[in-house]
C-alpha cells in the first residue's frame, strides 16, 4: 500500500504568476485500464488530489498527459479537461487508427498535442513516429516523445526531420547513464538548436542512478541543457509519480520542486521554463498580454 502526500510545508522557491505544470496524469473513477498498458495507480489519484498539489506548490495552469494505463482511449483525458478547461490543456496518444473525427473531438476538448512512449507499456511507439508527426503537424499539435535516451543515436536523424514541435520527456531518460560531455548530450543539443525540440524537466528519479535527494547524475545534464537553451526548457511535476509503489519511494513534491528548480542558472531561466516556454509549446494565453 502506498500513502501519498498532497500537502505540507511549501517549497522555498516561489513559483511565478501563471506557472505551468507541463506533465501530470490524473485518473478519474469509472475509466478502467486497458490491455497492453500498466494498471491504474493505487488509489487512482485524480483532480481533487492534484488540486491540493497545485495549491501546495503554487501552480496556476497545467497539462494533463494521457496515462499509459488508458492507452489510446481518451475518455478519461477528455473528462478531466472538461472540468479544468479554463486552466488546462491535454496531450493525447493518437496512432494510425485514430479517426479524423476523434481528432476534432480531442481538439475541441482542449488537446494540443500527442505523445509517443517507446518503452514497455507505451501506447504508441517510435515505429509510428512519421505518421504521428504528419497528423500532429496538420493539426498544429506538439508531440511529447519518450524513449531510452541512451539510444538517441539510433533516432537522431528521424527526430531531426520532424515537422512538428516536440519535447523530449523526462530529462532525456538516459536509462544506461549519461555524462554532460558525452555524445548523447551533444546530439541532444543539436536537436534543440534545430528550433523544434524542447527538453522537459520531469520525473528525474526515473533514470537517476545516484537517486535522491539531489539526483546528481540527472542534475548534471539538466544544468547543461538549462544553460545551453533556457528558451527550450519546460517543467512538470510528473504527478502522481507512478513509478513509486511504496510510501518510502514517493517523493515530497515541494522538496523535489526545490531540487529541480535549483538546476536552472538564474531566475530568468526558471521563469522561462515555468511560464513563457510552456505557454508557447502548449498554446496557453500569455499572461504578459
Where are these regions (language model features)?
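A generic "structured core" feature
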Residues: 19-25, 128, 132, 242, ...
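Conserved, mostly hydrophobic/aromatic
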Residues: 23, 54, 77, 106, ...
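Active-site gating/metal-coordination segments in enzymes
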Residues: 1-7, 71-157, 193, 200-207, ...
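Glycine-rich phosphate-binding "P-loop"
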Residues: 33-44, 61-65, 107-124, 247
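Mid-to-C-terminal alpha-helical segments outside catalytic/metal-binding sites
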Residues: 1-18, 44-61, 230-232, 246-289
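Alpha-helical scaffold segments that flank or form the walls of functional sites
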Residues: 35-84
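Catalytic pocket-lining loop regions of alpha/beta-barrel enzymes
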Residues: 126-235, 243, 280
Amino acid at each position: 500500500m502506498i500513502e501519498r502526500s498532497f500537502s505540507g510545508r511549501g517549497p522555498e522557491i516561489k513559483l511565478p504568476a501563471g506557472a505551468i505544470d507541463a506533465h501530470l496524469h490524473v485518473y478519474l473513477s469509472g475509466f478502467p485500464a486497458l490491455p497492453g498498458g500498466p494498471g491504474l495507480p493505487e488509489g487512482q489519484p485524480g483532480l481533487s488530489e492534484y488540486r491540493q498539489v497545485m495549491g501546495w506548490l503554487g501552480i496556476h495552469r497545467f497539462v494533463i498527459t494521457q496515462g499509459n494505463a488508458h492507452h489510446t482511449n481518451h475518455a478519461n483525458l477528455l473528462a478531466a479537461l472538461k472540468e479544468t478547461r479554463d486552466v488546462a490543456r491535454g496531450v493525447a496518444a493518437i496512432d494510425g487508427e485514430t479517426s479524423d473525427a476523434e481528432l476534432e473531438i480531442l481538439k475541441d476538448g482542449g488537446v494540443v498535442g500527442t505523445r509517443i512512449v517507446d518503452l514497455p507499456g507505451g501506447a504508441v511507439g517510435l515505429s509510428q513516429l512519421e505518421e504521428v508527426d504528419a497528423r500532429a503537424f496538420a493539426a498544429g499539435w506538439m508531440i511529447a516523445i519518450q524513449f531510452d535516451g541512451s539510444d538517441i543515436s539510433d533516432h537522431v536523424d528521424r527526430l531531426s526531420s520532424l515537422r512538428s514541435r516536440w519535447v523530449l520527456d523526462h530529462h532525456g531518460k538516459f536509462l544506461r547513464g549519461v555524462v554532460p560531455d558525452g555524445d548523447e548530450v551533444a546530439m541532444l543539443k543539436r536537436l534543440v538548436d534545430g528550433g523544434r525540440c524542447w527538453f522537459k524537466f520531469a520525473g528525474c528519479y526515473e533514470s537517476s542512478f545516484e537517486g535522491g535527494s539531489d539526483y546528481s547524475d540527472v542534475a548534471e545534464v539538466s544544468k547543461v541543457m538549462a544553460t545551453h537553451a533556457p528558451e527550450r526548457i519546460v517543467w512538470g511535476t510528473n504527478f502522481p509519480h507512478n513509478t513509486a509503489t511504496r510510501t518510502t519511494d514517493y517523493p515530497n513534491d515541494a522538496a523535489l520542486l526545490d531540487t529541480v528548480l535549483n538546476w536552472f542558472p538564474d531566475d530568468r531561466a526558471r521563469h522561462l521554463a515555468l511560464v513563457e516556454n510552456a505557454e508557447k509549446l502548449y498554446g496557453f494565453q500569455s499572461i504578459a498580454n
